[in-house]
């Protein structure tokens, strides 16, 4: 007997848990010793996500899963990961199988991780009522492209800590979180990806939530009453109104807003019907963060909010994505209002040229005549991503080095597809206001 086969069942089951259930089942042909080991692996990874054309293949898959459940008997299942693609002409029958498998896993108890990824050929499909009652479930992921019927009495997840909803809808509930969140009292992480809740009012309220990630195309009104939240990632198109923003414990925020080019032009010439000031409640709500990441659109939306920025007294790390179509107008005030900023990251240096950049950049040609945001900043670390070594970028780097008096380290990350190597010597020879400043180039 080989050494692996002599290992205890518990260890063999743990090894097989890293394989898909289909792959683990293949080990049953190795010897009598291996015949039933895979059956008792506490995690199931069932994958039928490919768009098979042969109906017989799905029948074989269903038979395999049903046989597996029968052979497992009452042995515990800690995790179920199910990826499956359903065709329109067989969807109702196939949904019944899926619903049965989920019920069998939840009803036996002990499951801590449930990951369902169901896709359909064609339009959104209605999945029959799913009963989510479990005293042990810790992680639940649902996706993508289907509608769930959800009733108040069919949801009770007292141990759930992570909930991920990826492109799913809920039938007949204008505010699904009034049903879900109160029945998940320990929930710490909520992920909402590309939701299609046409009737959702955009409200999230939870005293236990620590991490929240939302990615929607558009939500008219967003309410965030999550006083214990420490991480927020928000991605949506400009136009949402923010109300009741309670983020007193927030440590890190990623604002990935985007603005259509035509709408951005209207904002600049004052003809937009949208109200940029509606973002001010969000900006004020995140004022206590230590780490802030902004897309180029989000940075410009800060400027068009039309009101004085709050003080970001706790901010130590600021990351800004730059694009030639978006400006740095708000950057001088943002840096000025961040007195404890230590690390400043630019994901690219190219940006839309305006006269409002102050001495943050060299593009306007009015250096020294506007706010001295860089000269008064105590930034110690400056990072530049996607550096191409152009003459304009080199000039901008020289400006940073001469204005930031407390710099200790400059990290330069070159763009990956450079055709001509960057001569680092030009950077190293630039004069610096700080005698302790070192330059580190990563190519």
From Swiss-Prot:
Domain F-box: 1-47
InterPro entries on file: F-box-like_dom_sf, F-box_AtFBL13-like, F-box_dom, FBD, FBL60-like, LRR_dom_sf, LRR_FXL15/At3g58940/PEG3-like
A Pfam family annotated for this UniProt entry: F-box
LRR repeat spans: 139-167, 169-194, 201-236, 271-296, 323-348, 363-389
PROSITE patterns assigned: FBOX
Domain of life (superkingdom): Eukaryota
Alphabetized UniProt keyword annotations: Leucine-rich repeat, Repeat
SMART domains hit by this protein: FBD, FBOX
Record's protein name: F-box/LRR-repeat protein At2g42720
